[in-house]
């Protein structure tokens, strides 16, 4: 695990991805967009409630998969301290809009997430300088944090994650194959093609649904799109957000997308309404061998009845030369900021709550079980199989595929354009429609950069 952390830090410094991703929360998978954010006021009534503490905590959570854990921890903290803690989780894909709306209220969030350096520019004056705080003192590294131009610590990176192709080893072996066969795109395709060709006999297919609705599209407009971005940026030594991109590896993007939408039981013509929950269900119910997602899904897969020994995560292969030496796509977009505009009592209460989350034995264990690896001194080791897979790849000398999508300008708008083009292409996979995907990808980047920077 230490080797994984060290390699991630090296990649962060080399590629300038010094912290979190875009304002759009890629892992958001709960609460339909039409509904208001899910809200819980902690705690529930208890027989021996602590005296009311000073200040209040309002945590605007951007990771729906962590909502249940955060609600539980909020209630526990209030029970122990008397400090009221409210956790609100934004609807899928709406974190940026929700944050803007909530910040305008009289009782604004006291803790919130800043996505990346671009997001920090938007929220700098609302973010307390965390330099010298006890929370900052618990960090094992500062390289995932966000600093403004004055060098002030404005957001603390509190976990790091990886994504790739989650694989059901038991089903793979039932189909007559093994993980060891898959070393690059060609071998992945050979295995997937064989499974798909025999799906009727096997009772399962290769890939789960590549849904393009709001709960799922980030997996492809963000995470899968990271592949062509990463390799282009690596070739061109890109270390900051470029004004334009070339689309050097768009053919590779097309190869892996074609595989996803072909070797599956999902109808490519209806992906615009296919959800992440449906895709996950296909995987947990044994209807698909492969499911593209990240380390954050581990706890949910186990809760759904899957066995740790049956799970592994493969790198995303797309046919790039030398990709057999690739590890998982790893980085972070989880950075805590404390609202500088609320009262000092609320600021202190919020900092105390965050400190408790990463130092209390019970809370820290719950955080690790939910989020994965945490860069704090008291954080226990994670039992997450996918993080162990990532560590093993680093130990074997493979290179980390860093989160190049952190550089995306106007991330929500750019991704939306890419999703629209991918949806049309999936329904009719012609060269003409793929040209529209490339246009959305390349021309859309330049357009959004100009919109963001003038």
Question: Where in this protein do the model-derived segments appear?
Answer:
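Extracytoplasmic "Venus flytrap"/periplasmic binding protein-like
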Residues: 76-141, 154, 170-176, 183, ...
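Glycine-centered hinge/linker elements that transmit conformational signals in sensory
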Residues: 192-193, 238-273
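Extracytoplasmic/periplasmic solute-binding protein
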Residues: 154-158, 163, 189-242, 288
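Conserved C-terminal helix/tail region of periplasmic/extracytoplasmic solute-binding proteins
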Residues: 173, 197, 362, 395-454
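Extracytoplasmic/periplasmic substrate-binding proteins
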Residues: 60, 222, 231, 256-344
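Extracytoplasmic/periplasmic substrate-recognition and gating elements
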Residues: 75, 80, 105, 175, ...
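Conserved N-terminal structural module of periplasmic/extracytoplasmic solute-binding proteins
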Residues: 6, 20-119, 135, 272, ...
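Hinge/lid segment of periplasmic solute-binding proteins
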Residues: 50-51, 115-166, 219, 312-315
């Amino acid at each position: 695990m230490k080797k994984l952390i060290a390699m991630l830090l090296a990649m962060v410094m080399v590629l300038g991805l010094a912290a979190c991703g875009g304002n759009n929360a890629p892992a958001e998978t709960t609460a339909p967009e039409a509904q208001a954010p899910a809200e819980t006021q902690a705690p529930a009534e208890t027989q021996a409630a602590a005296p009311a503490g000073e200040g209040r905590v309002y945590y605007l959570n951007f990771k729906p998969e962590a909502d249940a854990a955060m609600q539980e921890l909020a209630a526990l903290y209030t029970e122990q301290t008397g400090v009221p803690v409210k956790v609100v989780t934004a609807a899928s894909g709406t974190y940026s809009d929700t944050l803007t709306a909530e910040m305008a209220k009289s009782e604004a969030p006291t803790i919130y997430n800043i996505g990346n350096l671009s997001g920090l520019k938007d929220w700098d004056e609302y973010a307390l300088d965390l330099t010298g705080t006890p929370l900052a003192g618990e960090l094992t590294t500062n390289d995932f944090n966000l600093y403004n131009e004055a060098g002030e610590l404005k957001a603390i990176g509190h976990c790091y994650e990886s994504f790739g192709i989650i694989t059901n080893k038991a089903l793979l072996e039932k189909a007559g194959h093994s993980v060891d066969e898959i070393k690059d795109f060609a071998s992945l395709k050979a295995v997937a093609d064989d499974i798909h060709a025999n799906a009727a006999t096997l009772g399962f297919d290769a890939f789960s649904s590549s849904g393009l609705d709001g709960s799922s599209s980030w997996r492809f407009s963000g995470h899968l799109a990271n592949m062509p971005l990463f390799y282009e940026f690596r070739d061109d030594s890109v270390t900051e957000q470029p004004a334009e991109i070339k689309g050097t590896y768009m053919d590779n993007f097309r190869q892996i997308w074609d595989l996803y939408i072909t070797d599956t039981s999902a109808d490519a013509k209806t992906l615009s309404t296919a959800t992440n929950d449906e895709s996950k269900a296909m995987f947990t119910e044994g209807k698909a061998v492969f499911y593209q997602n990240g380390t954050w899904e581990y706890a949910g897969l186990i809760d759904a009845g899957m066995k740790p020994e049956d799970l592994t995560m493969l790198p995303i292969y797309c046919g790039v030369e030398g990709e057999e030496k690739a590890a998982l796509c790893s980085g972070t977009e989880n950075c805590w900021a404390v609202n500088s505009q609320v009262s000092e009592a609320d600021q202190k209460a919020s900092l105390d709550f965050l400190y408790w989350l990463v130092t209390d034995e019970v809370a820290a264990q719950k955080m690790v079980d939910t989020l994965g690896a945490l860069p704090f001194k008291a954080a226990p080791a994670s039992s997450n199989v996918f993080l162990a897979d990532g560590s093993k790849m680093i130990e074997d000398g493979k290179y980390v595929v860093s989160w190049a999508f952190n550089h995306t300008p106007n991330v929500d708008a750019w991704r939306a354009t890419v999703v629209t083009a991918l949806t049309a292409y999936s329904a009719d996979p012609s060269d003409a429609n793929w040209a529209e995907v490339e246009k959305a990808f390349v021309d859309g980047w330049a357009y959004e950069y100009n919109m963001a920077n003038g």
